[in-house]
């Protein structure tokens, strides 16, 4: 699912909302999650999951094209940990109908 499909879904589930309002709502949620992560905060959405920022230390790696050693700088990366409800639903769906296109 891409962002525009999510906006369309929110608009369809809430017929009193115009598509533009649904888009603004989705943008506001995503902007706030991003802002919280930028501030180093943990975003915990009950029964859905948790967004956190993790530190990746600097390390050496290899260029896959030529095998030369390269230095990879440290960085901060977003990480999502799915909540129990999502994990349970995915595992129930897997048992009943397979994983679809995974």
Curated annotation (Swiss-Prot):
Q: Does the keyword Lyase apply?
A: no
Entries under PROSITE patterns matching the protein: HISTONE_LIKE
One Pfam family named in its UniProt record? Bac_DNA_binding
Gene3D superfamilies, per the entry: IHF-like DNA-binding proteins
Summary of subunit composition and partner proteins: Heterodimer of an alpha and a beta chain.
Organism name: Rhizobium radiobacter
Similarity section: Belongs to the bacterial histone-like protein family.
The UniProt GO MF terms for this protein read: DNA binding; structural constituent of chromatin
- This chain is encoded by the gene named ihfB
Q: Which UniProt keywords apply?
A: DNA recombination, DNA-binding, Plasmid, Transcription, Transcription regulation, Translation regulation
Q: Explain the purpose of this protein.
A: This protein is one of the two subunits of integration host factor, a specific DNA-binding protein that functions in genetic recombination as well as in transcriptional and translational control.
Question: Mind telling me which InterPro entries this protein's record contains?
Answer: Hist_DNA-bd (IPR000119), Histone-like_DNA-bd_CS (IPR020816), IHF-like_DNA-bd_dom_sf (IPR010992), IHF_beta (IPR005685)
Q: Could you identify this protein by its name?
A: Integration host factor subunit beta
User: What GO terms describe the biological role, i.e. biological process, of this protein?
Assistant: DNA recombination; regulation of DNA-templated transcription; regulation of translation
Task: Identify the GO cellular component terms for this protein.
Answer: chromosome; cytosol
């Amino acid at each position: 699912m891409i962002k525009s499909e999510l906006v369309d879904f929110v608009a369809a589930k809430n017929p009193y909302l115009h598509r533009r309002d649904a888009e603004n709502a989705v943008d506001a949620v995503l902007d706030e999650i991003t802002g919280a992560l930028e501030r180093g905060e943990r975003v915990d959405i009950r029964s859905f999951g948790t967004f956190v920022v993790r530190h990746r230390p600097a390390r050496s790696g290899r260029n896959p094209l030529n095998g030369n050693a390269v230095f990879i700088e440290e960085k901060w990366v977003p990480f999502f940990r799915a909540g129990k409800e999502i994990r349970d639903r995915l595992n129930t769906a897997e048992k009943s109908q397979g994983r679809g296109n995974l």
